[in-house]
Amino acid sequence: MAMSDKKDVVLIGAGVLSTTFGSMLKTIAPDWDIHLYERLDRPGIESSNERNNAGTGHAALCELNYTVQQPDGSIDIEKAKEINEQFEISKQFWGHLVKSGEIQNPKEFINPLPHISFVRGKNNVKFLKDRYEAMKQFPMFDNIEYTEDIEEMRKWIPLMMKGREDKGYMAASKIDEGTDVNYGELTRKMAQNLKNSPNVEVQYKHEVVDFERLSNGKWSVKIKNLNNGQVFEHQTDYVFIGAGGGAIPLLQKTGIPESKHLGGFPISGQFIACTNPQVIEQHDAKVYGKEPPGTPPMTVPHLDTRYIDGERTLLFGPFANVGPKFLKHGSNLDLFKSIKPYNITTLLASAVKNLPLIKYSFDQVIMTKEGCMNHLRTFYPEARDEDWQVYTAGKRVQVIKDTEENGKGFIQFGTEVVNSEDHSVIALLGESPGASTSVSVALEVLEKNFPEYAKNWEPKIKKMIPSYGESLIDDVQLMRKIRKQTSKDLELGFYDKAK
């Protein structure tokens, strides 16, 4: 297929994934027509919003669920390597957007912040030390520090050590080159850049309501203008569904075979936010603990310094909260409307297989503020009720699907790319670490669904992401070079301690 073949692409949803994919596509295929439709009145309102997500640069520096203890006691860090490389890829793309002038003021969406792991108990301390020993041997993580010394911990996490009377087994590890990322602000910047670009149309308060496959192979997308109630149709070659929790219902409306035997289980996140500036100023890190035994990885608690609206904040959580909505601004009928004759056995099988997760979720629902505060005090013993308030964050929809390997009703953690056989429909489903790995997800979409353009697009992608086609895991010199460059481009001020 010749590069002169002009195509039309519809992007659904103005979150971080759609705006990332759109930003990339308009650069490598500037003559293509791109139409982005968002049902809300502005971009980044749902899961991408800074108040609705965990806000971390998921780089596997402190998240302990990415480093798994094996039956022989060893620590497998392969997943951590993969996640870290993906975040480095994201930073390269963001740095390109800044250098090219497409977005400005990187400090408004990314700031340096130490990433720390903190554990208590003999077994957890041994796990963290073994993890440290495994990670420091690998160049990607060789700047990791570890301590069991209380005085050192007082320097790293002074707020958490205040009033701590349990002087038993405790340990912490730290990597200074972590970040806090405001994905809402990043999304807004990318959306505005798209709106200002030729051959790109961005429409807010426009809801995609249905699809029809045409005899010429194209899709007729039915769109409702929520400003005046008018419905119109738009013909397109490709449909990209990046609508967060709304992706599964939209995918089902396409009727493609790949939309069958898929379901979703909606979970809200709740955090408690500190309202006392004097407390907020005493903590300067993102601190992860270890998930309680028998609970899913999304339950890992963390105490996070966050930068929101230019101000420093402090959040603790998440706590799960189940409900039928697939989106924060969704309908209480979302879950029930997604149950179809072709996926009901998938959902029922999942319910039987995942009773502990369901029990955990409902236990969390009935947790009061007092319960949240008691959990917080395992991190910050002197926490006072009057300094904290509970708020509901965004929705995540855990993907439930049938697989050959895991049978019916398997719950998929992470981000899932689903596409039609002819690659005309592409949907992004799932959750964490989606935002942090959004650039790698966009690259996967390009490689998987547009192979005929790969040769022509590669030089342009390489300009945006210098490590494209190479491994930051295997090539240590390239990894160090890229980190130094992105630190400069994004004004992070990091330096590589490794020799």
From Swiss-Prot:
Task: Look up the record and name the cofactor or cofactors this protein needs.
Answer: FAD
**Which cysteines share a disulfide bond?**
none
Looking up InterPro entries in the UniProt record yields:
FAD/NAD-bd_sf, MQO
Q: Which domain of life is it from?
A: Bacteria
SUPFAM superfamilies listed in its UniProt record: FAD/NAD(P)-binding domain
The first-level EC class reads: oxidoreductase
What keywords is this UniProt entry annotated with?
FAD, Flavoprotein, Oxidoreductase, Tricarboxylic acid cycle
Q: Which Pfam families match?
A: Mqo
Pathway participation: Carbohydrate metabolism; tricarboxylic acid cycle; oxaloacetate from (S)-malate (quinone route): step 1/1
Q: Which PANTHER family match?
A: L-2-HYDROXYGLUTARATE DEHYDROGENASE, MITOCHONDRIAL
Indicate yes or no for the key word Flavoprotein. Answer: yes
Signal peptide bounds? none
Q: What is this protein called?
A: Probable malate:quinone oxidoreductase 4
Organism, per UniProt? Staphylococcus epidermidis (strain ATCC 35984 / DSM 28319 / BCRC 17069 / CCUG 31568 / BM 3577 / RP62A)
Query: What GO molecular function annotation could you give as one example from this UniProt entry?
Result: 2-hydroxyglutarate dehydrogenase activity
What is one Gene Ontology biological process annotated in the Swiss-Prot or TrEMBL record?
tricarboxylic acid cycle
Q: Is DNA-binding one of the keywords UniProt gives this record?
A: no
Q: Which NCBIfam families match?
A: Lac_Quin_Ox_NO, mal_quin_oxido, PRK05257.1-3, PRK05257.2-1, PRK05257.3-2, PRK13339.1
* Reaction(s) catalysed by this chain's protein: (S)-malate + a quinone = a quinol + oxaloacetate
Q: What is its EC number?
A: 1.1.5.4
Tell me the protein family, please: Belongs to the MQO family.
Q: Which Gene3D superfamilies match?
A: FAD/NAD(P)-binding domain
